[in-house]
């Protein structure tokens, strides 16, 4: 077999990236919008014959030229990406793949977490990673009616607080999951701290980190789904496949979501959730948004006000716990990040 080389491809290398895009296109996929490492495999004439990428702790965008399939090249590309991740300190890895490719990745030491029928499989490189996460959750399982809320809280607003209060009042135990991944302007440690402070007076709320198993729409891989509607649908169905297993571990029979009049993406997501959850015996409860100044309270409005320093409006949008934090010296690095972010609406 010929000797091929694998090397990193930088964003400035437009010629190689164009070859990669052509190769991905031949496989019916496209370059994902979220990538922080791209590699290519080259033949003796420096033609791209294979590619793969990383984002955070995930592996993405694999393809091998049809002229070279059967040579074990994808195995070499995956091995290279795993070495890159190990060098970064990422030992727990995840990937999303088409259902037909899942056996191949299974042979490379990846295990299924959940799948969306005929669409995609979510996998990790730990045999018992998700199982251990579920067993850890089970320690907080309670009798009586249990419900769930999943929120990014970027940051925690009076709207979030209202949603938690409504859900907590309707059940014996409310399991509140804060999305752990750091794809938001407000870091996870701060988001979790503000949620914890904002719900401290609700004794039946149990706070959980989502871990790597519940991800945001911002980082969901879209490269093998044909359009935005398919991406939203795929993400929602995968999230629900994961959540259904979490619900079984915690005896959850209802999931609460905030109404999304302004966001088409989240609105469609909620619609799919309300269609699918009852099939798993889980009620989907959509709570109308709390309003301030005649408008639904939104975290994006809060980020805009933090960016512009509009503290008068912030007093009508944030609970005292969040307001006190943002007025403290501790918040200065986060505020600086928000001020320098440009468009903060969809962050």
Indicate residue ranges for each PLM-predicted region.
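Short amphipathic alpha-helix that is part of the acyltransferase structural core
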Residues: 1-31, 42, 47
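RNA-binding accessory domains that recognize and position tRNA/RNA substrates
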Residues: 30-31, 65-68, 83, 88, ...
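Conserved GNAT acetyl-CoA-binding A-motif
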Residues: 85-98
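Conserved acetyl-CoA pyrophosphate-binding loop and the N-cap/start of the following alpha-helix
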Residues: 68, 72-80, 159
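Short coil/loop residues immediately preceding or within conserved phosphate-binding loops
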Residues: 36, 59, 144
């Amino acid at each position: 077999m010929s000797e091929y080389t694998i090397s990193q491809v930088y964003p400035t290398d437009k010629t190689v990236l164009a070859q990669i895009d052509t190769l991905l296109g031949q496989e019916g996929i496209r370059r994902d919008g979220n990538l922080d490492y791209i590699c290519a495999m080259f033949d003796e004439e420096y033609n791209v014959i294979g590619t793969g990428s990383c984002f955070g702790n995930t592996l993405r965008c694999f393809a091998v030229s049809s002229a070279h399939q059967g040579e074990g090249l994808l195995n070499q590309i995956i091995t290279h990406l795993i070495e890159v991740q190990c060098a970064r300190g990422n030992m727990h890895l995840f990937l999303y793949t088409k259902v037909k490719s899942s056996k191949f990745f299974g042979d490379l030491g990846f295990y299924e977490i959940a799948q969306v029928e005929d669409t995609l499989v979510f996998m990790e490189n730990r045999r018992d990673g998700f199982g251990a996460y579920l067993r850890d959750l089970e320690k907080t399982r309670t009798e009586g009616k249990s419900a769930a809320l999943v929120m990014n809280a970027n940051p925690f607003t009076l709207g979030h607080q209202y949603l938690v209060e409504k859900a907590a009042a309707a059940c014996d135990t409310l399991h509140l999951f804060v999305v752990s991944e750091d794809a938001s302007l407000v870091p996870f440690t701060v988001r979790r701290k503000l949620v914890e402070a904002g719900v401290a007076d609700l004794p039946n709320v149990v706070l959980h980190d989502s871990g790597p198993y519940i991800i945001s729409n911002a980082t969901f891989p879209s490269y093998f789904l044909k359009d935005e509607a398919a991406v939203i649908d795929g993400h929602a169905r995968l999230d629900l496949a994961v959540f259904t297993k979490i619900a079984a571990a915690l005896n959850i029979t209802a999931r609460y979501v905030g109404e999304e009049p302004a966001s088409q993406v989240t609105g469609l997501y909620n619609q799919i959730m309300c269609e699918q959850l009852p099939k798993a015996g889980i009620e989907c409860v959509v709570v109308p948004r709390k309003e301030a100044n005649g408008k639904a309270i939104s975290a994006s409005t809060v980020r805009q006000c933090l960016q512009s320093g509009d503290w008068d409006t912030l007093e009508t949008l944030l609970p005292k716990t969040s307001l006190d934090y943002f007025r403290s010296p501790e918040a200065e690095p986060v505020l600086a990040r928000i001020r320098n972010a440009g468009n903060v609406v969809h962050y």
